[in-house]
Amino acid sequence: MTATTDLSRTWPRRAAVLSLHTSPLEQPGTGDAGGMNVYIAKTSAKLAELGTEVEIFTRATSSDIPPVAQLAPGVTVRSLLAGPFEGLDKNDLPSQICAFAAGALRVEARHDPGYYDVVHSHYWLSGQVGWLARQRWGVPLVHTAHTLAKVKNAALAEGDTPEPMVRVMGEEQVVAGADRLVANTEFEAADLIERYDADPEAVATIPPGVDLERFTPGDRSAARAEFGLPADAVVLGFVGRIQPLKAPDVLLKATAALLDRHPGLRERLVVLVVGGPSGSGLERPRALHELARSLGITDVVRFLPPQRGDALASVYRACDVVAVPSYSESFGLVALEAQACGTPVVAAAVGGLPVAVADGVSGLLVDGHETRRWADALASVVLSPGRRARLAAGTTGHAAGFSWESTTEALLDTYARARTTFDARLRIREVTA
């Protein structure tokens, strides 16, 4: 199931990348933009550097967005009209699959036959479009799910909304129809095989990477000064979309418990919550503020909007610990970015986080989401400078094992394997026709 690069391959001249529900041009950390946006942007740019031109198809969400934009040299983003710009909830997007597919097919029709060599779809909505494009364009389909409905529904946060059956059925169709499936970790690969009956030979395990040039250790005092934080503060951080799935409430509840046990810590403690509302979190965008107020910790909690680029790296550097308490996470790029900056991570032992975080080496993994356990884990790091230093020493070495270059090389290998599968399926169909 693990992709290798020893297979001789023909690199595709041009790849069509489908991302219906969110654009790589959007700011991660708010709305539906997150790790998937980073993944698409980084791998597309690296594919172009390696000689494969990339066209990314996404849905237009504003009249201010140009229909065609350049993300990086050799990478074009096409924003297609499919439904209204505003007021369309993510749960309503299945109604726009046909409109989006029609837009993509019209773009391809303006080119000579065989213009695209491979289709790579991201998330199940795009997978449905990729399923159709595969048939119409006669090219292999590679699909990356990023999240899976059956996995999310098996680990719902309290008060969160289950993924609908239409998504489950859509994912099952894409899994069956794709020539190659990309899983972020062996855990996700197992979910595809066991929960979705994927062919084990069709699943490639390719971990995401991290930008090791941007996310590096730096001056903590300088980073804290950027956000007006005292140099001697004890800083806990959360970075991500504000929604039940990402569980920032777990961090706030653990913070309250930590202060109950160690009231003297209040004078120095700062909890940074960096991100914007998303998904079911949009239903009550102020819910986390209300929780902080009810817990009596508004004096230590600071809310910041999503941060870009170097500012995001400064957030990680400013923290003593970054918490990733998600209920479900196919990988966890935030955890990897924080470690690349030299900051230990305390994360939930779910999904791909046991791969993203080396337990006891670069951070700690916590079983479950019980407040007491999280307070214990956080206390064991922030109240023990020696332990924090030992974990910090293991962060950059662990993060160095993940690069976008290696991710993209493995994707190219997977594209070649997908072509082999596609050709074999085509021959079988011709023989049985």
Swiss-Prot record:
* One Pfam family of this chain: Glycos_transf_1
**Name of the protein:** D-inositol 3-phosphate glycosyltransferase
Q: Report the sequence similarity comment from the record.
A: Belongs to the glycosyltransferase group 1 family. MshA subfamily.
Provide the species name. Saccharopolyspora erythraea (strain ATCC 11635 / DSM 40517 / JCM 4748 / NBRC 13426 / NCIMB 8594 / NRRL 2338)
Q: Does the keyword Hydrolase apply?
A: no
Gene expressing this chain: mshA
Q: Lineage of this protein's species?
A: Bacteria, Bacillati, Actinomycetota, Actinomycetes, Pseudonocardiales
Q: Which PANTHER family match?
A: SULFOQUINOVOSYL TRANSFERASE SQD2
Q: Which residues bind 1D-myo-inositol 3-phosphate?
A: 21, 32-37, 90, 123, 147, 167
Question: Recorded GO terms, molecular function?
Answer: acetylglucosaminyltransferase activity; D-inositol-3-phosphate glycosyltransferase activity; magnesium ion binding
What biological function has been recorded for the protein in this entry? Catalyzes the transfer of a N-acetyl-glucosamine moiety to 1D-myo-inositol 3-phosphate to produce 1D-myo-inositol 2-acetamido-2-deoxy-glucopyranoside 3-phosphate in the mycothiol biosynthesis pathway.
Instruction: State the InterPro entries in the record.
Output: Glyco_trans_1, Glyco_trans_4-like_N, Glycosyltransferase_grp1, Mycothiol_biosynthesis_MshA
Keywords of the record: Glycosyltransferase, Magnesium, Metal-binding, Transferase
Which NCBIfam families does this one have? mycothiol_MshA
Could you say which residues bind Mg(2+) here? 316-317, 319, 343
EC numbers on record: 2.4.1.250
